[in-house]
Amino acid sequence: FNGQTIPLVGVRVRCHHLLHFEECFTNANGEATSLGSFKQPARYKIFWEDQKYWDIRDGLTWQAKTKGPRMTGRWELVISGDTEDAMFAAIHRACRAIFHDNPFGITRPKRGRIKLCAFYKKDVGKNGDHAGITVGIWPDIRIFRKVKGNTRSRWEITSTALHELGHASHHRAVVELPGSNRIEDFVLADGILKESWARGIQFAFMNWLYPNQVNKIRPDYFENYTGVVEGLMNQGLTLKQ
């Protein structure tokens, strides 16, 4: 978004040669420092999933992963452009911000791992969607890179992921948490309420991820997608309130 190289925290990295496997998660500097050592060239792979909270899929079914080289020594990967790997990384950043960092103290979406499907080539005319109830292989969240023939950037992918995770947070707070069970309140809620809340999540978290911008990062506001949450935050209220 601002041209800086950003370390990816909490990425699952695996290194293996034959039956020798080593695995760890990247630290605050984006480094996998606990992979052990190999006498022979080893294959690197990244699996875009969290142990506890989320699982990113390549399309509907396949695990999202990045295949690295077979080599000795240190593998340095810089993800740039609008590649498929960049899409996975963009969704990962959104998940990390919501589930682990959670600077605004909102309700974490879903008990157990949430499934987010990334569609790199498929175009169905929408940025993404969230399903409160899923069956079989159907995901909780779908995110699309192409929308009506237009290709969206990494930061737009992150913003969409935050929006859909905002819906998932809303669903859990109203329906899933102990003592809530107000499914009708969620199902029958006006679209303007649901979409404006998710827009507020986008606004707050995108500006937290990319601070010190000359102008605030704002999602498009139109019809049901209003800026009421931003307005309330400007009046001193917090997202949690």
Describe every region a protein language model picked out.
Residues 1-19:
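Short, ordered, surface-exposed loop/turn motifs in non-cytosolic proteins
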Residues 45-67:
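A short, solvent-exposed loop/turn motif at the edges and junctions
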